[in-house]
């Protein structure tokens, strides 16, 4: 029996493998979340210097998603392999650097745990299938985008656009929606928030959201078809309004403070892709339509 046949015939083993893989990917996503915005800023600065015809900055050491090796931000201690095992290392080190004993942010293990649990659930929901593999990629991308948006109010094109094209490609095989529905989903998803953006700007003179949000909703439409868009917009708006109000009441945000909308879109789109039909059917039954 090949490993593929074993996983296909043992759902629990597939779920456990997906969970472990998710933990490992979550560790890498922590690197992406931290380094990708820095890489983008350096690229923008380089382009600005070139546009202004300024001398290029001297080339420094390589800085990308793989180099240099991760180090403690407090003492510059290079993280060893055994200190980089998802969850286990953080627990073994009791959340502190092995060299200087400075605290390690709890967000690192939480991202790893979230990625692992979400990956395990996707494997359980879809079973051993192409849908599960595709949904894992989308889940990891949405998690990275959401955290970057929380930190920087930025949704990188380098993450959003490849996933948009991937959604169209996989739906050319009808994995989640027909190609026609996926194309309309991408177009309508972009135009829906673009229209809201300009209407809000005309009325208030302010920008209510960023262009990255348009692209993110277009990407979700490319994955689930235009049918997932109404539920995605509704859920993200409700959750965003509720959490925004809670944050204002708790004085964690001031009135007028920009609140990233990307995480709400990501969560709502993920929910709509997994349970959209069930949620819609339950609502129609409740409303007796």
UniProtKB/Swiss-Prot annotation:
GO terms for cellular component: plasma membrane. It is found in: Cell inner membrane. Signal peptide: none annotated. Its EC number is 3.4.23.43, 2.1.1.-. Its cofactor is Zn(2+). Plays an essential role in type IV pili and type II pseudopili formation by proteolytically removing the leader sequence from substrate proteins and subsequently monomethylating the alpha-amino group of the newly exposed N-terminal phenylalanine. Zn(2+) binds at residues 72, 75, 97, 100. Keywords: Cell inner membrane, Cell membrane, Hydrolase, Membrane, Metal-binding, Methyltransferase, Multifunctional enzyme, Protease, S-adenosyl-L-methionine, Transferase, Transmembrane, Transmembrane helix, Zinc. The keyword Transmembrane applies. GO terms for biological process: methylation; signal peptide processing. It is a multi-pass membrane protein. The keyword Translocase does not apply. GO terms for molecular function: aspartic-type endopeptidase activity; metal ion binding; methyltransferase activity. Pfam families: A24_N_bact, Peptidase_A24. Zinc is required for the N-terminal methylation of the mature pilin, but not for signal peptide cleavage. Belongs to the peptidase A24 family. This is Prepilin leader peptidase/N-methyltransferase. It catalyses: Typically cleaves a -Gly-|-Phe- bond to release an N-terminal, basic peptide of 5-8 residues from type IV prepilin, and then N-methylates the new N-terminal amino group, the methyl donor being S-adenosyl-L-methionine. The lineage of its organism: Bacteria, Pseudomonadati, Pseudomonadota, Gammaproteobacteria, Pseudomonadales. The chain crosses the membrane at residues 13-33, 128-148, 159-179, 183-203, 228-248, 256-276.
């Amino acid at each position: 029996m090949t490993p593929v046949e074993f996983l296909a015939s043992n759902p629990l083993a597939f779920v456990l493998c997906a969970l472990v893989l998710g933990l490992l990917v979550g560790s890498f996503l922590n690197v992406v979340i931290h380094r990708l915005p820095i890489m983008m800023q350096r690229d923008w600065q380089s382009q600005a210097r070139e546009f202004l015809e300024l001398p290029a900055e001297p080339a420094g050491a390589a800085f990308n998603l793989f180099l240099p090796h991760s180090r403690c931000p407090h003492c510059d201690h290079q993280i060893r392999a055994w200190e980089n095992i998802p969850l286990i290392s953080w627990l073994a080190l009791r959340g502190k650097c092995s060299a200087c004993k400075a605290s390690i942010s709890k967000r690192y293990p939480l991202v790893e745990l979230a990625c692992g649990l979400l990956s395990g659930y996707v494997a359980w929901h879809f079973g051993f299938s192409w849908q599960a593999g595709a949904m894992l990629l989308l889940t990891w991308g949405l998690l990275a985008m959401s955290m970057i948006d929380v930190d920087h109010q930025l949704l990188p094109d380098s993450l959003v656009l490849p996933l948009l094209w991937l959604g169209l490609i996989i739906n050319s095989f009808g994995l989640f929606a027909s190609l026609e529905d996926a194309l309309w989903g991408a177009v309508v998803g972009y135009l829906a928030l673009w229209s809201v953006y300009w209407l809000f700007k005309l009325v208030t003179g302010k920008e209510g959201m960023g262009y990255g949000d348009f692209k993110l909703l277009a990407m979700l439409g490319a994955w689930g078809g235009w049918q997932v868009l109404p539920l995605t917009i509704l859920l993200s708006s409700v959750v965003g309004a509720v959490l925004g109000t809670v944050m204002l009441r708790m004085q964690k945000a001031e009135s007028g403070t920009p609140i990233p909308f990307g995480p709400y879109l990501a969560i709502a789109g993920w929910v709509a892709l997994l349970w959209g039909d069930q949620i819609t059917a339950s609502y129609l039954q409740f409303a007796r339509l």
